């Protein structure tokens, strides 16, 4: 019997098995669709396909950094349960897959599936792992960042395998880049804990900032109502939420207000130049709350909470003898954006006993 493309398409859609596997199964079954499904299941491929409708929202985030800190890859591979995520075989699968993505320069899931790992097509290798481990597994996403001779990349994955970060930096020289690797890893650890969304306030959309500013003021004003009732100090209500709202005109206005304040306090003008920089720094701290929450450079460093990441980078640049600029930031948190399946255990038991 002739095996048509439509037959292969139908079998693939109903089982989730690979195109060539479906074609071979239909050939062995002489075109019998049900028998072809049985053949796939007997080979373990049908078993993998049968699990494909179950949501995989657990798993591992894996990070692979090359020995010279010039290339780093992060991946998220999902399983259905945390139990499987702790399985050594699954952990090895995640590690091997991430290393394969990096060494082969793979950019997309489609490229990954058609690549070859240990002499086997990756799609088939992965389905074999699904059949062996016994749960639906999904390579959900991955990304690789690279650096030239004057750049450095590093990464960090939290011990529970649920959060991973990559950061890439451009440096003034190759020597500075070589010295900065451990510092960049420390920044990755910070980002894993503090969850910045972007590198800088320059990466924030202005419309988003305006909406968030309205929400921020409302939040602080609401909290102030309770603080006032309790007789506690009130929150400062900021004029701005991000540096992207503070241009030259806004800074000039703030400086003038500081000068008027100093004049009212009777401070001699000859010492204003020593006082104003500190007050301007305080002005920025009070009016960049959104940057402190969402941007890497605007956050206070977990290892020294008196300084922002931007300030720490400036200090490290001076220490190492050349400029360091963060140019790439990737953070994966396991299952973000996925809806975790909640089983109705009673309904499941009832279904099984009929």
Swiss-Prot record:
GO CC term (a single one): cytoplasm
UniProt keyword annotation of Ligase present: no
InterPro entries per record: EF-Ts_dimer_sf (IPR036402), Transl_elong_EFTs/EF1B (IPR001816), Transl_elong_EFTs/EF1B_dimer (IPR014039), Transl_elong_Ts_CS (IPR018101), UBA-like_sf (IPR009060)
GO molecular function, one term: translation elongation factor activity
Transmembrane spans: none
Localization per record: Cytoplasm
Residue numbers spanned by region Involved in Mg(2+) ion dislocation from EF-Tu: 81-84
Superkingdom classification of source: Bacteria
Alphabetical UniProt keywords: Cytoplasm, Elongation factor, Protein biosynthesis
PANTHER family according to UniProt: ELONGATION FACTOR TS (PTHR11741), ELONGATION FACTOR TS, MITOCHONDRIAL (PTHR11741:SF0)
Entries under HAMAP family matching the protein: EF_Ts
Family in the record: Belongs to the EF-Ts family.
Name used for this protein in its record: Elongation factor Ts
Source organism: Campylobacter concisus (strain 13826)
Lineage: Bacteria, Pseudomonadati, Campylobacterota, Epsilonproteobacteria, Campylobacterales
């Amino acid at each position: 019997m002739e095996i048509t493309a439509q037959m292969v398409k139908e079998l693939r859609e109903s089982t989730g098995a690979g195109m060539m596997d479906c074609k071979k199964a239909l050939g062995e079954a002489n075109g019998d669709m049900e028998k072809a499904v049985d053949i796939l299941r007997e080979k373990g491929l049908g078993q993998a396909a049968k699990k494909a409708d179950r949501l995989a929202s657990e798993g591992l985030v894996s990070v692979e950094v090359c020995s010279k800190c010039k290339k780093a890859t992060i991946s998220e591979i999902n399983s259905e349960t945390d139990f499987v995520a702790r399985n050594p075989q699954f952990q090895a699968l995640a590690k091997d897959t991430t290393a394969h993505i990096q060494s082969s320069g793979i950019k997309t899931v489609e490229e990954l599936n058609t690549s070859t790992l240990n002499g086997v097509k990756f799609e088939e290798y992965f389905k074999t792992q699904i059949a062996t481990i016994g749960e639906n597994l999904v390579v959900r996403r991955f990304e690789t960042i690279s650096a030239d001779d004057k750049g450095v990349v590093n990464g960090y994955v939290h011990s529970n395998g649920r959060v991973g970060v990559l950061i890439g930096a451009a440096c003034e020289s190759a020597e500075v880049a070589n010295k900065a690797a451990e510092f960049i890893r420390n920044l990755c650890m910070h980002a894993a804990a503090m969850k910045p969304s972007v590198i800088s306030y320059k990466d924030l959309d202005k419309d988003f900032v305006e909406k968030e500013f309205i929400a921020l003021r409302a939040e602080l004003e609401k909290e102030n109502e309770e603080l006032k009732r309790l007789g506690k100090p009130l929150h400062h209500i900021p004029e701005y939420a991000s540096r992207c709202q503070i241009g030259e005109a806004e800074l000039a206005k703030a400086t003038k207000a500081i000068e008027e304040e100093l004049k009212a306090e009777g401070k001699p003008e000859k010492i204003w130049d020593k006082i104003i920089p500190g007050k301007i720094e305080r002005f920025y701290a009070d009016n960049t709350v959104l940057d402190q929450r969402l941007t890497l450079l605007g956050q206070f460093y977990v290892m020294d909470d008196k300084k922002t990441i931007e300030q720490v980078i400036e200090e490290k640049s001076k220490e190492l003898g050349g400029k360091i600029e963060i140019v790439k930031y990737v953070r994966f948190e396991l299952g973000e954006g996925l809806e975790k399946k909640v089983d109705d255990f009673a309904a499941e038991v009832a279904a099984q006993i009929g």
